[in-house]
């Protein structure tokens, strides 16, 4: 029996989100297994996976030789290897790049479409899951395994959980929360990631940015002490020579349409508007507010005013839940 996804509805902000079960169809799961899996993935991503415990998950970037990100990966350990979650739109291209040198190692790299990705967020999310699972993750143990399920804990923008599970458990959870929880699609999780300042790399922006342009260093996603990995020289240069002049920003406001990933924005300069930045993700909330995640210059004034191109409405900067000060 397959897992049936949920119909779309406008997402809510974390502050107003009722208990919600979210089908994460826009994200995809992949795995690397085999005796060389740790050594191999260590040579491909920005984070130091050798230091990662069974109870941790982390965000890392997979870069090209120029240090530009193919994608960001939410990594965690699994059996004799690792699993990761990324945007479905970049899955195929990212796996193709990751497999390029796999012929020289004892590893198997593959997408995993058998399992289901679900999010649980909103009012009393922990209490709802406690009725289903014997143990839940928290700030100290961010990853918990329970039977066929792996549960990942997220702190921002408010406590939420990501479940990697089988179809039977996904259907059981949907049934148990029926009538108690709202059901929504990937847009709700996307809205929460945007609020949390977690970079969203879709196909339109793959190969465009170094990790620091999306604040990955502030999210613990870059190790400057580990050994070589693809793109390391350019990522290190950006830090030690101050070559990175960009950052990820959260904007909120109104617009007559939801812009696409890859579009630019316009910055108000006196009476005029100047094109700036690149949109990573955007979504419209149920109260009409537009949330936009964009890469722009890292020296913007906090009071800067923006707009979707040629739109009559405006957007403003919203503080992120972490600091970029090093």
UniProtKB/Swiss-Prot annotation:
It holds the Pfam family YgfZ_barrel. GO terms for molecular function: folic acid binding. It comes from the Bacteria. Folate binds at residues 27, 189. The keyword ATP-binding does not apply. Its main location: cytoplasm. Keywords: Cytoplasm, Folate-binding, tRNA processing. It is found in: Cytoplasm. GO terms for cellular component: cytoplasm. One of its GO terms (biological process) is iron-sulfur cluster assembly. Folate-binding protein involved in regulating the level of ATP-DnaA and in the modification of some tRNAs. It is probably a key factor in regulatory networks that act via tRNA modification, such as initiation of chromosomal replication. Belongs to the tRNA-modifying YgfZ family. PANTHER family: TRANSFERASE CAF17, MITOCHONDRIAL-RELATED (PTHR22602:SF0). This is tRNA-modifying protein YgfZ.
């Amino acid at each position: 029996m397959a897992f049936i996804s949920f119909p779309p509805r406008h997402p809510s902000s974390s502050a107003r989100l009722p208990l919600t079960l979210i089908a994460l169809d826009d994200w995809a799961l992949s795995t690397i297994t085999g005796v060389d899996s740790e050594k191999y993935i260590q040579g491909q991503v920005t984070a130091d996976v050798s230091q990662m415990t069974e109870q941790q998950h982390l965000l890392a970037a997979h870069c090209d030789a120029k240090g530009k990100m193919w994608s960001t990966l939410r990594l965690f350990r699994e059996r004799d290897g690792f699993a990761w979650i990324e945007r479905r739109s970049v899955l195929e291209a990212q796996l193709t790049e990751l497999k390029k040198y796999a012929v020289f190692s004892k590893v198997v790299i593959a997408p995993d479409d058998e399992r289901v990705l679900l999010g649980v967020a909103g009012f009393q999310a922990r209490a709802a899951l406690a009725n289903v699972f014997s143990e839940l993750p928290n700030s100290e143990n961010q990853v918990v395994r329970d039977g066929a399920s792996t549960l990942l804990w997220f702190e921002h923008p408010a406590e939420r959980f990501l479940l990697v599970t089988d179809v039977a458990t996904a259907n059981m959870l949907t049934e148990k929360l029926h009538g108690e929880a709202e059901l929504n699609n990937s847009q709700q999780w996307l809205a929460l990631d945007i609020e949390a300042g977690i970079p969203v790399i879709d196909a339109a922006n793959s190969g465009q940015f170094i990790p620091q342009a999306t604040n990955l260093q502030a999210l613990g996603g870059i190790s400057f002490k580990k050994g070589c990995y693809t793109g390391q020289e350019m990522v290190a240069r950006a830090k030690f020579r101050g070559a990175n002049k960009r950052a990820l920003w959260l904007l909120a406001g109104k617009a007559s349409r939801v812009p696409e990933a890859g579009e630019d924005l316009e910055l108000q300069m006196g009476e005029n508007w100047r094109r700036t930045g690149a949109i990573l993700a955007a979504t419209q909330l149920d109260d009409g507010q537009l949330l936009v995640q964009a890469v722009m210059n890292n020296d913007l004034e906090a009071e800067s005013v923006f707009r979707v191109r040629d739109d009559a409405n405006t957007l403003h900067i919203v503080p992120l839940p972490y600091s970029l000060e090093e």
